[in-house]
Curated annotation (Swiss-Prot):
GO CC entries: epsilon DNA polymerase complex
Organism phylogeny: Eukaryota, Metazoa, Chordata, Craniata, Vertebrata
InterPro entries the record matches: DNA_pol_a/d/e_bsu, DNA_pol_e_bsu_N, POLE2
Cellular localization per UniProt: Nucleus
Protein's UniProt name: DNA polymerase epsilon subunit 2
Keyword Nucleus: yes
Native organism: Bos taurus (Bovine)
Amino acid sequence: MAPERLRSRALSAFKLRGLMLRGEAVKYLTEALQSINEIELEDALEKIIDAVEKQPLSSNMIERSVVEAAVQECSQSVDETIDHIFNIIGAFDIPRFVYNSERKKFLPLLMTNHPAPNLFGTARDKAELFRERYTILHQRTHRHELFTPPVIGSHPDESGSKFQLKTIETLLGSTSKIGDVIVLGMITQLKEGKFFLEDPTGTIQLDLSKAQFHSGLYTESCFVLAEGWFEDQVFHVNAFGFPPTEPSSTTRAYYGNTNFFGGPSNTSVKTSAKLKQLEDENKDAMFVFISDVWLDQVEVLEKLHIMFSGYSPAPPTCFILCGNFSSAPYGKNQVQALKDSLKTLADIICGYPNIHQSSRFVFVPGPEDPGFGSILPRPPFAESITNEFRQRVPFSVFTTNPCRIQYCTQEIIVFREDLVNKMCRNCVRFPSSNLDIPNHFVKTVLSQGHLTPLPLYVCPVYWAYDYALRVYPVPDLLVIADKYDPFTLTNTECLCINPGSFPRSGFSFKVFYPSNKVVEDSKLQGF
């Protein structure tokens, strides 16, 4: 393409996004894009502008150095290496993005005035934790077709089916009765026995005597859409519902190729044609999920022997072993007992050379394993416990709880916590149908966009690292390893599984095939 035409196209593309290029920057960009054909030019410019906007910009006048950095980032993302195929991402390595309401986009932490996260959080971190949860759900709800403002000149019936979110401040400022209002807020119990709704603008007392609850587990500290009327400083609730969920593809349509998930890739792996091709071609790839691997129980070790001998001819890509790794979690000898148990497991694995050389082993600590108490995210086991095992089984990774796994273009979140029980115990009102608890549970987690929509005194979280527990954008596979009965569900284009407790459920586990997104229920009973 002629340099003048290329220059004109580049300037126009930047202008459309409210950016101006300095002369040197235009010259560099024209040279860099000279080899690209006209069909690919528009996509290339879009990617470069996205990379420019990720950088901390002091003004809309773009310097050459900024464009150079953006071009370099884009050229790296095109040249995917083997490192991008399989990655285990610890909770403390997940990138943090903060939603900017003015720019209507997520900004990386460096481009905000937020400090770097610290385990010993400040009061601001605690308040920010709930504000960010609210903001993410608010922007997601606002984009839903029921809450988008009607188009000017649209049919009256269409306008009538739209809803408008109100803030609590709006209600508190009114002296008269307000009917048919919908408010997005968090359920709290500020006084014993009295529930309130809270948002960044204020709190309001709730009257739940006539409230109807849609499907889900409505716990304290979860965010709800409350519909009802306001009178005498009390919000009388007719119905409670959860904020609408959103498929990952819809989220990415708004926020482009930003890598929210983490890992070495600068951009989201979802956009990579190379990785997608590798994923489709490798039909033998499989992930085995096992929870409550009690290594101190002879019967569990025998079943692992049977499992490894069965898989030895065609080793899985990865075994994900979740805690607890001991049936007797407490005691002065707990750490030494775990080291001995891991040594026994290493002996078993080394007895199957195919698995030892081909499969990866990922260890996710459980709530009663040795470590730093019950606060999430939970760090991996201490190196002093795992050193010997890692030397003998080099393809092993001891990671955090929760953790993330990226395989080609697929995103997997793994979380070991007895969450179903906690959420059922802390419900504002328990669902009438006990049989459908897994559906209620999965809907709640995905609607909240968070792994633990519970009060902090029930499920403590490091305030500054709360973002590591987000389930937004929705992953391809969500594994919540719980002692509750095993289940497999699909909701919002997301597969949600619970492998169940290995010893308690008759030695059941789950097998996931990424190439066709199929989950297989497996059991070792009767062997």
